[in-house]
């Protein structure tokens, strides 16, 4: 009898442990909303985001309040998964610290976007991109994201629709400098540092030309910050988790605090410097 009771108690404990391990549905629902795997690269995440966003963009759904709300929620999703530090924190804790996206909203968003995703094809994306780049709508989104990320352009490019740092950096700089001079947005040290670097590089001859399709994630990882982030997370996840855990503990006391742009870039350099020697040692 005692054994049966113990077995039953053990079963109950196992059930509780299993439920705890399952965690809240929100733990993986950010990825489910976009219809990507948890280990998806940043390129895959951005592609899924762009595909959904072009259908929900306010300019294409001016009379649809529901579409506008979902577009805003979609932007919050990409603001987490498209940001190196926020994604690392989310992967570790499952927490998003955003009261504007309640847990039960993820299931609704996931189902809605899953249906929406099927309705979008490559032709839709190309048509949207051709009309969007260089438009007033693009400028409006640029200024909104500039304010949101406080001039941190690396993060802005991760969320900006149809953007390419190689093609758009000079163009965006001109637009932002004009907006800053007109008092539409406020400059920041992070932006000024980025703008100085861009000023020293040669602008593209045709920035609004049709963007080339990217053929290889390996090649993109050398030029696209978002892909570099994803690649490092996959290859050195343990080290990334450890590094960002220390950042989280440092800034965790203040919900508004976050690493500076210098710390953000220094963290990236540390990971790269640790990864390169390991490749050499393998070759020996």
UniProtKB/Swiss-Prot annotation:
Q: What does this protein do?
A: Plays a continuous role in plant development probably in the structural organization of compartments.
Report the protein name in the record: Chaperone protein dnaJ 6
Instruction: Return the Acidic residues bias intervals.
Output: 255-265
Q: Which organism is it from?
A: Arabidopsis thaliana (Mouse-ear cress)
Q: Which InterPro entries match?
A: AtJ6-like (IPR042977), DnaJ_domain (IPR001623), HTH_DNAJC9 (IPR056453), J_dom_sf (IPR036869)
Q: Which SMART domains does the UniProt record give?
A: DnaJ (SM00271)
Per UniProt, the short sequence motif Nuclear localization signal occupies residue numbers 3-6, 209-215
The Basic and acidic residues compositionally biased stretches are 266-275
Q: Where are the annotated segments for Disordered?
A: 1-30, 196-221, 252-284
- Tell me the SUPFAM superfamilies matching this sequence: Chaperone J-domain
Describe, from its UniProt entry, the tissues in which this protein is expressed: Highly expressed in leaves, flowers and siliques, and to lower extent in roots.
């Amino acid at each position: 009898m005692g054994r049966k009771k113990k077995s039953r108690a053990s079963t109950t404990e196992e059930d509780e442990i299993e439920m705890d391990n399952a965690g809240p549905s929100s733990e993986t629902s950010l990825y489910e909303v976009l219809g990507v795997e948890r280990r998806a690269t940043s390129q895959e995440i951005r592609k899924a985001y762009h595909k959904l966003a072009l259908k929900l963009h306010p300019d294409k759904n001016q009379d649809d309040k529901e579409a506008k709300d979902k577009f805003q929620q979609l932007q919050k999703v990409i603001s987490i998964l498209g940001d190196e530090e926020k994604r690392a924190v989310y992967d570790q804790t499952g927490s998003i610290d955003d009261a504007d996206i309640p847990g039960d909203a993820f299931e609704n968003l996931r189902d809605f976007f899953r249906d929406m995703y099927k309705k979008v094809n490559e032709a839709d994306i190309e048509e949207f991109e051709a009309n969007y780049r260089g438009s007033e709508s693009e400028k409006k989104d640029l200024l909104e994201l500039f304010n949101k990320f406080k001039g941190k352009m690396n993060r802005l490019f991760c969320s900006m629709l149809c953007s390419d740092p190689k093609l758009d950096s000079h163009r965006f700089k001109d637009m932002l400098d004009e907006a800053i001079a007109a008092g539409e947005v406020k400059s920041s040290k992070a932006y000024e540092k980025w703008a100085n670097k861009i000023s020293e590089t040669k602008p593209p001859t045709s920035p609004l030309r049709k963007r080339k399709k990217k053929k290889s994630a390996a090649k993109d990882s050398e030029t696209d910050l978002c892909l570099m982030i994803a690649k490092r997370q996959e290859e050195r996840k343990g080290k990334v988790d450890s590094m960002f855990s220390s950042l989280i503990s440092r800034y965790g006391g203040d919900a508004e605090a976050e690493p500076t742009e210098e710390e953000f870039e220094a963290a990236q350099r540390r990971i790269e410097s640790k990864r390169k020697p390991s490749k050499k040692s393998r070759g020996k």
